Structure formats: C-alpha cells, structure tokens
Curated annotation (Swiss-Prot):
Keywords annotated in UniProt: Cobalamin biosynthesis, Glutamine amidotransferase
A Pfam family hit: GATase_3
Biochemical pathway: Cofactor biosynthesis; adenosylcobalamin biosynthesis
GO molecular function terms attached to this record: ABC-type vitamin B12 transporter activity; catalytic activity
Protein family (similarity comment): Belongs to the CobB/CobQ family. CobQ subfamily.
Role noted for this protein: Catalyzes amidations at positions B, D, E, and G on adenosylcobyrinic A,C-diamide. NH(2) groups are provided by glutamine, and one molecule of ATP is hydrogenolyzed for each amidation.
Identification of the protein by name: Cobyric acid synthase
Gene Ontology biological-process entries: cobalamin biosynthetic process
Active-site feature positions: C330 (nucleophile), H437
Keyword Ligase: no
Membrane-crossing residue ranges in chain numbering: none
Ranges of residues in domain GATase cobBQ-type: 249-445
Regions annotated as coiled coil: none
C-alpha cells in the first residue's frame, strides 16, 4: 500500500491544488509511482476521462504532473453547483442526482465506502498518494462527519501539511487559528505548515516563523514565493477573469457568466501571438471585439436570465446584427437558439426564449450526455467557412438536446469513444454553436479562426509552429517542482511521509 501525505489550507485559494501538483511532480521526478487524490471537489470545471466519466479538473492537472492519465478514482465525489444552495452530485464519475446543501450534508457519510474503495485501489497501484483537502479544516460548522479534510486524513492515516496564503494578509493568525480549532486527536496529524505566495525579504518574515513554531510546536517547512507559473488552476481564476484589456491584434471577448464552466476551453487563444482574451460582465466592457464567445455554464436558464437583465444580451444582439462573429459552446450554444424548454426541471423548469441567433430549440433531458468525441466540420458558411473539413477532438457534458427548427443541416459529425456517431453544431453565417468542449484545442481549429479574423483586418497571422502544448505544460510542472524544491524542506517532508501516523 502507498504512503500518503495530505495538503490542507487555512482557507480557499491558499494554494492547496498547486502545492499538491508540485509535490506530485517532485515525487514522480524522484522515481516514485504517485497519484493525486481528493475525496470531494466542488467545481464548475470538469473533465471527461477516456472511460467517459466526469471528474474535477484540479485532479486532472495533478495527474498530468504525476505523469498519469486522469482517473476518476482520483476524485470520487464531484459537486457541481447548480444554484447557491443546490449541487449536482457526481459519484465515481456518474450523476447521483441534485441535492440541496442541507440534504447532502446529512447524506455524505454514506459515500465513505465509495471514497475508500477509490483511495485503496489507487494506493495498491502507487508508492505515494498526495491528498488534497478542500476549503479549510477550521470551518468548525462543517467538522461534523467531515470526509474531505481531517476526516479524510483519519481515513487514510495521512500526515497533514497546512498551507497559508500570506499574500492575503493575516497568515500567522490563520495558521495559528486553524491549528487551535482542531481537536487534540487532529492536532497529532498536523506535521508542518507552509507559507505560500510570499513576496519580499525573507529575513523580515523569519522572526514570525519562529514565534509561530513556539506557539504551536509545529515546524514551518518552507516559504513558497509568489510564482509566475502557467498551470490550469481554479485558484488562479481571479487573475484570468480580471483581464479586461484588449491588447492584441485580435480581441476575443468571453462572457463571464455567473456559473461559467470549463473555462479552459479558451486557454489555447492565450498562447497565440497577437491575441488577447477578455472576460466581461458588463455591456460597457464589450467595446468592439473581433469575436464574442458564450461559454458553457452549469445553469443555462439562470445565466440566460442574468445575460438578459445585465444588458449583455442586447449588446450581443446588436454586435451580431452587424455581421460580427459569435461562438457558443454547450450552455452558450443552447442560449443562441430560439427556445429553451425544461420539462423535467433539470434546472429551473419551464420555458424561456433564447437569443434567437440560431433557428433551433433545446429541450433539457434527465440523462446527461457525457463522452469524449472526435469530429469533422462540414456545411459551414460565412466567417467560419474556413473550418470546413478540419478535424477536432473534445468532450461533451450536457443535459439537453438541440434541434434545428427549419431543417438546417448540422455542421459536424461526432464519433464517440464507444463508436457511436451523431451530429452536432449549427451555423448561421456569423453565428456558430456546438456542444463540444475543447473544440479549439486542436491547433488548426484555433489557427483557422484567428487567421480569418486577422485577414478581415488586413493582417497576416504567423503561427508559432514550435509551440507544443504538452511540452509547454510539462515545462511549467517542472518549473513548479523546482520552485517547491528550493522553498520547501523536502528532506523533512520525506521524513513525515515515511513516518506516517
């Protein structure tokens, strides 16, 4: 069985996911078979495995850092919020159902057998499991029947490292308070603290580290600097979403819906020379972009109402009426149609009108479509005509069927992992919609779109032919590992790992 170590945090966004990924890469570099694990993740961004199962993206990143194929066992429970009080509960990659927070709180301990089956299975195949907590173990209102922080540490007999974010201020108080709010039994699991996101002179910080150690009698295992490392991380969303500047030759606007999901769909554009990607929430921020993207969402009906009430719907309709391109993905695709119907109350129930930019209607179904797919574009016209015959790959995660109302032809044929074939995508000159997440990741798709947009402006697109996304990601994981090796007492961490509980 594998040895285990766990990273918890004093708060959300303390850097647990990144530190976990970095430790995974370090252990893998040192020759160990390593796997990440998070018993329960709450996120709007998910991933479809090769088996067609759904898991959190943070564990996908950690799996990549471990040189492993993402495996649903790494994240047996995924909660996807559908409203402020309700989440879709996904267990072992399959939908269990929608639950209000109170009902899930009472139910969650029934999932411990699923958690431990997944954990023990991974532990049998690996040398080291790096476990990530969620939120903070100091949330004493959630301590009862905890399955993700100290509760998980006890189940796995895993020593715990507590990370605190000094960039937010109050790191000593948060580390001290987190420790003091644990029971005497739980305190025995905490073997070290980590100061994360530090900027400045370390010598000025050192007296505080000594005082903290004197107070809680737990060593500080390192001070991790604020790092400029490009890794898909939900903790860094605020940095990505805060970009409102249109600094590139091609300006792409993504509508930042309240429940935006799978934001990684647009990462590929951020690596392209001369392209800027902005996330906006107000009509005044729209300006005059070259492309508007309506992204996926975990609550299409609710976010469509928000789009309408915010005034962005009117702005998008005016933009589209000028012949400028709008691209919708998944929930964004559904919004582009004329009508959305929810007879089974998958979301809010009822019927609502869409933007009417595509002659189609969507009916929400109780069963989720969930598959990795390969496809090819055809029957495209207007600004997207250059995509015809291009190949793409991606994945579907949705609970609706979109049907053209006037006999319009679908614009792509999809082949699923099980060999099934179906149609997807609708185009109306400057408007395009698809259910496929990751559709831009195939280089020629993104490059064709950017080349077309540049040609409209009399510019020439020169692709970076030397760029390889897999190589780029691995270099970033290596940079992260190097930074953590320099910042952390890895000898002490290995000792903690080997001694266990």
């Amino acid at each position: 069985m594998a040895k285990a170590i766990m990273v918890q945090g004093t708060m959300s966004n303390a850097g647990k996911s990144i530190i976990t990924a970095g430790l995974c890469r370090i252990f893998a570099q040192d020759g160990y078979k390593v796997a990440p694990f998070k018993s329960q993740n709450m996120a709007l961004n998910s991933y479809i495995t090769k088996d067609g199962l759904e898991m959190g993206r943070a564990q996908v990143v950690q799996a990549e850092a471990s040189y492993k194929e993402p495996d649903v066992r790494m994240n047996p429970i995924l909660l996807k919020p559908t409203s402020n009080r309700t989440s879709q509960v996904i267990v072992n990659g399959e939908i269990l159902g929608n639950m209000p927070a109170g009902d899930y709180f009472k139910y969650k301990t029934k999932l411990i057998p699923d958690i431990m089956k997944a954990y023990n299975s991974l532990a049998e195949e690996n040398d080291i499991i790096v476990i990530e907590g969620a939120g903070s173990p100091a949330e004493i209102n959630l301590k009862q029947e905890d399955i993700v922080n100290m509760g998980m540490a006890k189940l796995a007999k895993a020593p715990v490292l507590i990370a605190g974010d000094i960039d937010q201020g109050g790191v000593f108080a948060s580390l001290y308070g987190t420790y003091m709010l644990q029971s005497e039994e739980e305190k025995q699991y905490i073997k070290g603290t980590i100061i994360n996101k530090f900027r400045g002179d370390l010598k000025i910080l050192e007296p505080g580290l000594k005082m903290l150690e004197d107070l809680i009698h737990i060593p500080t295992l390192g001070v991790v600097p604020y790092m400029d490392i490009d890794i898909d991380d939900e903790d860094s969303l605020s940095d990505r979403f805060s970009n409102k500047n249109s600094g590139g030759d091609v300006d792409i606007v993504v509508i930042r819906l309240p429940r935006i999901s799978n934001f990684t769909d647009f990462n590929v554009f951020e690596y392209m020379e001369g392209v800027s990607v902005r996330y906006i929430t107000k009509p005044s921020q729209l300006k005059n972009p070259d492309l508007v993207i309506l992204p996926g969402t975990k609550n299409t009906l609710g976010d469509l109402k928000w789009l309408r009430e915010s005034g962005l719907e009117a702005s998008i309709l005016k933009y589209a009426a000028e012949g400028k391109p709008v691209f919708g993905i998944c929930g964004g695709y559904q919004m582009l149609g004329k009508t959305l119907k929810d007879p089974w109350h998958v979301e809010e129930g009822g019927e609502i009108s869409g933007l009417g930019l595509i002659n189609a209607e969507t009916v929400f179904e109780r069963e989720k479509t969930r598959s990795r797919v390969k496809g090819q574009f055809h029957h495209l016209s207007g600004i997207f005509e250059g995509l015809n015959h291009k190949i793409f790959e991606g994945y579907e995660i949705h609970m609706g069927i979109t049907t053209p109302l006037g006999g319009e032809a679908f614009t792509s044929s999809l082949e699923a992992m099980d060999g099934g074939v179906k149609s997807d995508g609708l185009c109306s000159n400057n408007i395009y919609g698809t259910y496929v997440h990751g559709i831009f990741d195939e280089g020629q798709v993104a490059e064709t779109i950017i080349r077309t947009l540049m040609e409209k402006k009399g510019l020439v697109y020169e692709p970076n032919k030397n760029f390889n996304m897999v190589e780029y990601k691995n270099k970033e994981y290596d940079k992260l590992a190097d930074a953590l090796r320099k910042a952390l007492d890895m000898e002490a961490i290995y000792r903690i790992l080997n001694e266990g509980i």
